[in-house]
């Protein structure tokens, strides 16, 4: 499955040779910011709407979260309709009804709907579990594959105007939860005091290793070897953070603790 900027959700059954749209007729908006497939039941898929990689030109908004129970054949909206932009979705590996959704929020004005939301009933009810301020949304979210109660989230303080794109502020940061996302603690040791857009990823091979890619005065790739207690800048090559305010992601390899992937524009 992949979510497109303007064409909904698409699916392939042959490893990517051919793709077909599976959301037409069900989605009210065409822009998808996140897609997640349940490990416990691959028929269950969640799609978060709204273009999460924003630019000074046209950026499309969305209308919440959609869920499919039949591998994409049909969809229904399950809430967060005021979110405007969703950047991340993670599903509990053993319970497809428990998930967290990162809301980046309205790109053009302050909004109290930003933040991280938790549901334990498949989207029937939502609880906001992490909120910083009206201009700070969620830009990254990762779950420890070895312990799904441990999660990391990155927040992004930003605002776009027709004449300006502001990326960064006191609201940007990295947070950790050890209770399934209900409570969060900010991680600061070794990280820049003021950051722009960031992303975070915990290693599936070694839960102590956490990577952060950060837009900041000291931009680059940061690594923690103690579960986020402290971080160290390990690579400041500017190629890693090119146009970071637009598109920046980091993924730790699930099986090799020394392999990490950084994506940018």
State each model region's role.
Residues 1-265:
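Beta-propeller blade termini and top-face loops
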């Amino acid at each position: 499955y992949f979510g497109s900027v303007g064409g909904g959700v698409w699916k392939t059954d042959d490893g990517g040779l051919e793709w077909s749209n599976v959301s037409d007729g069900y989605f009210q908006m065409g822009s998808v910011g996140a897609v997640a497939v349940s490990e416990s039941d691959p028929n269950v898929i969640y799609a978060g709407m709204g273009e999460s990689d924003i630019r000074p030109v046209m950026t499309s908004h969305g209308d919440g979260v959609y869920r499919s129970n039949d591998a994409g054949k049909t969809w229904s909206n399950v809430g967060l309709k005021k979110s405007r932009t969703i950047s991340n979705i993670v599903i509990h590996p053993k319970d497809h009804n428990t998930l967290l959704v990162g809301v980046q929020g309205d790109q053009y004005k302050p909004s109290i709907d930003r933040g991280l939301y938790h549901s334990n009933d498949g989207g029937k009810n939502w609880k906001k579990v992490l909120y910083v301020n009206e201009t700070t949304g969620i830009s990254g979210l990762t779950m420890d594959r070895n312990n799904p109660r441990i999660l990391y989230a990155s927040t992004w303080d930003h605002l776009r105007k027709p004449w300006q794109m502001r990326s960064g502020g006191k609201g940007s940061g990295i947070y950790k939860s050890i209770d399934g996302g209900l409570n969060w603690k900010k991680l600061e040791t070794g990280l820049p005091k003021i950051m722009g857009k960031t992303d975070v990823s915990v290693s599936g091979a070694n839960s102590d290793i956490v990577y952060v890619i950060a837009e900041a005065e000291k931009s680059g790739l940061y690594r923690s070897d103690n579960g986020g207690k402290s971080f160290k800048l390990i690579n400041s090559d500017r190629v890693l953070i090119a146009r970071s305010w637009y598109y920046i992601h980091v993924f730790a390899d699930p099986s090799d603790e020394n392999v990490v992937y950084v994506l940018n524009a």
